[in-house]
């Protein structure tokens, strides 16, 4: 059984729901967490109190996606070089 015949047996409403879940899941687990990482990396030392509070709230809300990328991203400071 090939993919086109399998997809033709599934109702269109079900396919739309699966597409919506995929898009929302991708936004929740990939797009927004990467945007948050980029925003925090760019503005870490210039954030105001309210901006930092909002970013921390979004980190709490998007924590599953943040934890997926945490092992692969390194935002440590460069340091003084060889001492």
UniProtKB/Swiss-Prot annotation:
A GO molecular function held by the record: quinone binding
GO cellular component: plasma membrane-derived thylakoid membrane
Localization annotation: Cellular thylakoid membrane
Keyword check for Membrane: yes
Family listed: Belongs to the complex I NdhL subunit family.
Subunit structure comment from the entry: NDH-1 can be composed of about 15 different subunits; different subcomplexes with different compositions have been identified which probably have different functions.
Listed name of the protein: NAD(P)H-quinone oxidoreductase subunit L
Taxonomic lineage: Bacteria, Bacillati, Cyanobacteriota, Cyanophyceae, Synechococcales
Name of the coding gene: ndhL
């Amino acid at each position: 059984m090939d993919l086109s015949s399998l997809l033709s047996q599934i109702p269109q409403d079900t396919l739309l729901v699966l597409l919506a879940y995929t898009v929302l899941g991708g936004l929740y687990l990939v797009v927004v967490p990467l945007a948050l990482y980029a925003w925090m990396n760019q503005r870490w030392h210039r954030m105001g109190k309210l901006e930092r509070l909002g970013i921390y709230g979004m980190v709490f809300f998007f924590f599953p996606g943040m934890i997926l990328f945490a092992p692969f991203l390194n935002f440590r400071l460069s340091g003084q070089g060889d001492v």
